[in-house]
């Protein structure tokens, strides 16, 4: 399995990653936003935390739902396909955003998405990755405010949108 990843992760990654991790992850109320995913035990840097699962569907079939803040679509394949966790999804759909994440989402060549630990994660710590949302319209303060970030990190961008 070829893994495309940033230099923030170790060169050798744990490629054995289950679709569900009740032994490792707990979904519960988050101080950041609604529900969140928390580590039931410590996780080492480079470990695969979970696969982000759901039905792979064309972006065009869900574009009208994308503005609904309760959606959990994960865009893949150059924005033409999304993973819809409403069908066949798992606890990964509850992972919240942070501008200072402890995990990173990695898309495989086959369109599967895995969440890897960027650093050691302590038992009880909430799991985060940077959503880095992309928009088709020009980036303005109004557009950024439509996807506000509440992560509270020292380096918070104030938006879920990708850094410019």
Positions of PLM-derived features:
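Catalytic cores of histone-lysine modification enzymes
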Residues: 5, 10-106
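C-terminal SET catalytic tail plus cysteine-rich post-SET Zn-binding segment of SAM-dependent SET-domain
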Residues: 2-3, 99-164
């Amino acid at each position: 399995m070829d893994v495309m990843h940033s230099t923030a992760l170790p060169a050798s990654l744990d490629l054995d990653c289950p679709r569900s991790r009740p032994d490792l992850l707990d979904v519960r109320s988050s101080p950041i936003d609604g529900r969140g995913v928390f580590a039931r035990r410590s996780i080492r840097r480079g470990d695969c935390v979970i696969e982000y699962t759901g039905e792979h569907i064309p972006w065009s079939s869900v574009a009208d739902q994308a503005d609904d803040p309760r959606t959990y679509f994960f865009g893949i394949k150059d924005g033409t396909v999304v993973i819809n966790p409403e069908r066949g999804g798992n606890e990964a759909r509850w992972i919240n955003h942070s501008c200072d994440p402890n995990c990173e989402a990695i898309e495989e060549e086959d369109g599967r998405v895995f969440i890897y630990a960027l650093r050691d994660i302590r038992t009880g710590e909430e799991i985060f990755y940077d959503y880095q949302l992309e928009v088709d319209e020009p980036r303005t303060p109004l557009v950024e405010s439509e996807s506000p970030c509440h992560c509270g990190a020292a380096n918070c961008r104030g938006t879920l949108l990708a850094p410019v």
